[in-house]
Amino acid sequence: QYTQWAVDRGFAVIDINIPKHVTEPEDSHEYAAEADPQQRTDETESLAKYLWDNYIELSDSDHIFFMGVGQAYSSLIGFLKKNDRCREKLRKIIGFISDSCPLPSYKSATDDYLDRWYKDTSKIYVAADHYLWEKHKMKPPSRKWGSLQKSDYNDMQEMLAYHHKEVTGILNAEINGWQPSDVPVVVASEVDM
């Protein structure tokens, strides 16, 4: 739904789907164990770096959006922490975090501006039952978590559908005055395979 919306408006889109299960030719097809989470995170960060270095950064666009769903969002944040030069071109980071997915912080011991930039640039929809909301009942979460919005839903598909109009409105506001094909959007999400 989001990818088609972006393509229909002339965005240049890189849609990355990260499989939860990777099978090898010698595996029995009766059961495929979920890939090691750290290995998946590392591979996703590596792929994001490759795409940034070889495609996105080379483009003339200065309106770049990242959208991450589930664990893939955490991997995008890991990539951004290690590649601070991305901040110059990145206009908005949209994230969707389910109740079972950890929420990555964006804090640096050496860059005091980093968490402020992240708070201003991000919009993260967090599941209604995520542990973060219980932990921060009395005091709002700090800006190291980004600009958070509590979703009315826990199911990822329901969250994506419910927030579609709001997300596309945010992106429309960001692209005021742009030319078609000048706006790469990177969408990374987990898929069950």
For the regions a language model picked out, list residue spans one by one.
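Hydrophobic/aromatic beta-strand patches that form the interior of the parallel beta-sheet core
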Residues: 12-17, 65, 92-94
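Short, flexible/disordered secondary-structure transition segments
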Residues: 13, 59-62, 178-182
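Conserved beta-strand elements of beta-rich interaction domains across eukaryotes
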Residues: 20-21, 71, 99-101
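Gly/Ala-rich beta-loop-alpha elbow adjacent to hydrolase catalytic centers
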Residues: 66-77
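The feature captures the conserved acid-bearing segment of alpha/beta-hydrolase catalytic domains
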Residues: 83-192
